[in-house]
Amino acid sequence: MPLQLKKKAGKPVLHGNAGQQQNNSPAPQQSQEQTMTQSQQPPVNSQPPSSSTNAAFGMMDVPESERHKSMSPEEYNAKLDRRELLFGAIPMLPTIPAIDKIVFDYCDGLRVFVPKAEDGNFTTYRIFMKEEQFGTIVCHDVMTNNEQKFYNTIQKYYCHFGLTIIRLVPLPDSIRDNVMKHYGLTAIEVQQIYELCQFPLVKQEQIEEDIFNKCFVLRESERPRYAHAIDELLRYVQDNHTFHHSFDPKDKEIFVQFPISTIGDSIGWFSYLERFQKKTQCKLLAVMNPAIYDLYEKQYPTIKFIEARDTRNYKPYACYNMGLFFKANTTNQPYDFRYIGNGRTVSKILDVDDTDIAPRVDLSAPRRIKEPYVCIAVNGSAYCKTWTHPTGWQEVVAHLRKIGYRVICIDKDKVAGSGVVLTHIPWGCEDETGNKTFQERINILKDCDFFIGLSSGVSWLAWCAKCPVVLISGFTNPYNEYYTPYRVINPMVCHGCWNDETCDFDHYDYMWCPKHKGTPRAYECTKNITPEHVLNVIATIPAYQKMKAKYDAEHPEKETSKYLKTEIPMPVEEKKEEVKATVTSSETISAPSQSFDNQPCINIQ
């Protein structure tokens, strides 16, 4: 509804969407558009602050109330340093020229920097920032360059932001008088003023009540008079005074930055980058940990891979941060990742199809192990990620070895944990732990009959290696990772706290269990996943069925339909080299090395 000024009982009253408001009403509250963007004064070192960004994995959790405050130079520099440590650097100031030395870019959202006019010839600008796909105005401001100003959208994920900058020129008095005479100030619509003054950009936009109040002052007289603010409203614009830019990533350099310190989820996210590049036709630069991009560099020749330390050498058109952003952050992600799941959250950040597609990896290495074998990984970065059943791994490994499988553990560490809570590789498995490259682990995974693991990075590697994955996880819901028909979860007990929006994961608490920590029900999500449950899922894997049928044919007198409850005897050569040790929180067990021919340990070069 257009806003109108009418005389009522000798005193003008404002009519509009918000009801009735008299001239002595308090100043209007901050509009929705204003709350969606930042308009901040840069610190004295001319480094403009941007919105506080929650970095991945809880390392930069910033409460919502802190996201709109101006920062001191020290605070801003510290924020940039933290961001660079996590993702890599972006230019301090935007790098794309607009008009009158105003610059912008799409690094960390749409950023616009208006420098102060040094010659004293100040100019007034109207700044529009609009998401063009949805038609949402995220910034509508009028400013004068008698001081420098920095604008930064709250939204950091992929959006079609358009930028319009209008250089305002004073309107001749004759046109102003015609406007006043035309309406007689008895019934005036702001929309009509815009149309009459040839304001093509904004004449179709809804004029909010607070904007009207800023432009008019109602006096206790028979007719309202205009104050100085109306001069701003009654100005027109010619084509050479307007700059407009719509988001256009084609053939532009765009950073997609992965958290440097995080490995697991980053492995599974890479197929979304290729989809993003095909969609935008941009020159994509993947900023990643070298340990990961060595895995993908030859598989994706159209994507350029760089390390975080090299980002200072570029001036990208746009930049997007990949990661899991905590505490209900919707600044770096359009949806809370707990609703979407770890695997698909990047598809929402980049606005691409979220179909599960495993990234391509090199699977050309020759097979090194002749016998049928199974790979396992038992360690996790938090205790809730592990399989906490007291005899789970031992019974599963014993059964698989009984029917003829070699069971190889490919964790990084033989012993992992925190304090006195330690997880060891299961007895009876072959030790292939160590600080190996991802490609070395894929070379083992690609030829195994199946992999048994947790919600961890090795499970993402197994997915890339295209082997069947038995994924044991209770603290995540099934949609959190990629789809596997061999998912093992017990929904009859507490489960899925990772994807529970009421629970914020604590990265500094290895024993995190948000609902039952310190009670007998702690970690019941995996404690109540039995070995029989896991073996029943394994029994549906075709390769296992063939192995089991072969064993049954060779041992018709033995019953193996159920999992083994007794420990199988150790071979003589293993008994000789058995090591007994007491483990403290500061020790690591190093099992004696054995040759490839003498099981159970193998050493693959």
Regions found by a protein language model. Give the residues of each.
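Long, low-complexity, intrinsically disordered segments
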Residues: 2-20, 26-27, 38, 576-605
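Short, basic, low-complexity termini and linkers enriched in Ser/Thr/Gly/Pro
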Residues: 41-44
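Catalytic machinery of carbohydrate-active enzymes
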Residues: 49-51, 55-58, 74-580, 584-587, ...
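Charged, low-complexity eukaryotic segments
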Residues: 63-64
